[in-house]
UniProtKB/Swiss-Prot annotation:
Protein name as it appears in the record: Thromboxane-A synthase
EC number: 5.3.99.5, 4.2.1.152
Protein's membrane topology: Multi-pass membrane protein
Any one GO BP annotation for this protein: prostaglandin biosynthetic process
Keywords for the protein's UniProt record, in alphabetical order: Endoplasmic reticulum, Fatty acid biosynthesis, Fatty acid metabolism, Heme, Iron, Isomerase, Lipid biosynthesis, Lipid metabolism, Lyase, Membrane, Metal-binding, Monooxygenase, Oxidoreductase, Prostaglandin biosynthesis, Prostaglandin metabolism, Transmembrane, Transmembrane helix
Length: 533
């Protein structure tokens, strides 16, 4: 105050308030854009970000369309900001190979928001570093073809219920939204295979499991809260974790209790009495010493055997034994991920495949001929016969996943500073693979808008450039459930096409409008007619 007195200044309360307000506003203005110079420093092109929210408005139509626009405007390497978080988007095969395979040790972890609730955070999707490797190792054993073959009868039983519902639609002759029917079906499969519970969600929509699944997928973050989370993550994320959330807590509590009760019941049963489902497969390996090394984690490459091995395959690792058995929370977490993937991804892929077959009758006729020939030799299909005896069905599913990959974006986080093909990548950077932009690149896929299963003949796959087809990711952290997902898709379409054919009708939306808030799916359902054969 004495110093101020030399200049004959009097400091009043309002003046201090104004001064502090000016300082606060200046700091707020600086904060609103301070994170938005990083991409430019890296030499990565990107849309102009807005204060606080970054490029959030750029994605108002969904990530699918925006990824396509990023590729069109900025090429196979671009970036964007969601709030203060920087994303580097890649859709160039050589760079994808470096990130997912060659430099995997530096890009082991997926991005986590910090908002994942406890059961989901304990899943193999979000576990990190050493614990991820341990859990992935034992789960890779659990997802072996031998184990999956034991689950085929459970899926077939759910198919029988589905066929009964489709028969009613065939008799009516009216158009209907088959996506809604598939939603009920996949709910039944998830309940049976992952949660050890038999439901018929079409006939009993009020069943607690069905109702909680519906609430689980209907829940979302309100837009105002999303803006705050993105703009002030260091404050809002910890706050959101501790604030009460009745809906979240009720959902987590229901599924947690359900699985724990099933586990307790199974522990009292003799081994031969236990139901052979996904939950039991995970239970079997909880204390298992049977593990595999990281080089065995890439199940996707094993399934799509035509994919070439990398020039420099990952060095062999000794299997990492479990430092501690899988906790019950981790078992619950795996069932949660099965719910997310088994419901949304399988439902949408079945819907897209149905749409493509209905609007491409010549392809459907070819597939029906194959189904009829297969059915003469295999009345009750088994896992191995499904993999080997239906090559055209396999091609149809692969082309469906090229055109409409449900999991069309996935992330990896750089653990340390590095260079990828000359591009500097700082530690902590999130790299996002734009699968849709890759799958619609005419350099790799001529006439990409056309449905053409012949792209996936054995000869065509051998000629294709590696890392241009990524519906399930690639590398050691690729989709663990790819075998189970393909099994469900093949078995379901086989059962349906034995009895019915799909037909487009005036209500069929051509082309389909898409939504891509999380997984890629039809925006307005898939309306078709189904006809008995």
């Amino acid at each position: 105050m004495e110093v101020l007195g030399l200049f004959r200044l009097e400091v009043s309360g309002p003046m201090v308030t104004v001064a502090l307000s000016v300082v606060f506003l200046a700091l707020l203005k600086w904060y609103s854009t301070s994170a938005f110079s990083r991409l430019e420093k890296l030499g990565i092109r990107h849309p102009k970000p807005s204060p606080f929210i970054g490029n959030l408005a750029f994605f108002r139509q969904g990530f699918w369309e925006s990824h396509m626009e990023l590729r069109k405007q900025y090429g196979p390497l671009s970036g964007y900001y969601l709030g203060r978080l920087m994303f580097i988007v890649i859709s160039e095969p050589d760079m994808i190979e470096q990130v997912l395979v060659e430099k995997f040790s530096n890009f082991t972890n997926r991005m986590a928001t910090g908002l994942e609730p406890k059961p989901v955070a304990d899943s193999v999707l979000f576990l990190r570093d050493k614990r991820w490797e341990e859990v992935r190792s034992v789960l890779t054993v659990a997802f072996s073809p031998e184990k999956l073959s034991e689950m085929t009868p459970l899926i077939s039983r759910a198919c029988d219920v589905l066929l009964a519902h489709l028969e009613r639609h065939a008799q009516s002759g009216e158009a209907f939204d088959i996506q809604r029917t598939y939603c009920c079906y996949t709910t039944d499969v998830v309940a049976s295979v992952a949660f050890g519970t038999e439901v018929n969600s079409q006939e009993a929509p009020e069943h607690p499991f069905v109702e909680h699944c519906r609430r689980f997928f209907a829940s979302s973050i309100p837009k105002p809260l999303l803006v705050l989370l993105l703009s002030f993550p260091s404050i809002m994320v910890p706050l959101a974790r501790i604030l009460p959330n009745k809906n979240r807590d009720e959902l987590n509590g229901f599924f947690n209790k359900l699985i724990r009760n099933v586990i307790a019941l199974r522990d009292q049963q003799a081994a031969e009495e236990r139901r052979r489902d996904f939950l039991q497969m995970v239970q079997d390996v909880r204390h298992s010493a049977a593990t595999v090394g990281v080089e065995k984690f890439d199940i996707v490459r094993q399934v799509f055997s035509a994919t070439k091995c990398p020039a420099n395959p990952p060095r062999r690792h000794s299997p990492r034994p479990l430092s501690k058995p899988l906790s019950v929370d981790e078992v619950v977490g795996q069932a949660f991920i099965f719910l997310i993937a088994g419901y949304e991804i399988v439902t949408n892929t079945l819907s897209f495949a149905t749409y493509l077959l209905a609007t491409n009758p010549e392809c459907q006729e070819k597939l029906l001929e194959e189904v009829d020939c297969f059915s003469k030799e295999h009345l009750a299909p088994e896992y191995c016969s499904l993999q080997e005896g239906l090559p055209y069905l396999d091609m149809v599913i692969k082309e469906t996943l090229r055109m409409y990959p449900p999991a069309f974006r996935f992330t990896r986080v750089a653990a340390q500073d590095c260079e990828v093909l000359g591009q500097r990548i700082p530690a902590g950077a999130v790299l996002e693979t734009a699968v849709g932009a890759l799958h619609y690149d005419p350099e790799h896929w001529p006439n990409p808008e056309n449905f053409n299963p012949e792209r996936f003949t054995a000869e065509a796959q051998q000629r294709r450039r590696p890392y241009t087809y990524l519906p399930f990711g690639a590398g050691p952290r690729s989709c663990l459930g790819v075998r189970l997902g393909l099994l469900e898709l093949k078995l379901t379409l086989l059962h349906i096409l034995r009895k019915f054919r799909f037909e487009a009708c005036p209500e069929t939306q051509v082309p389909l409008q898409l939504e891509s808030k999380s997984a890629l799916g039809p925006k307005n359902g898939v309306y078709i007619r189904i006809v008995s054969r």
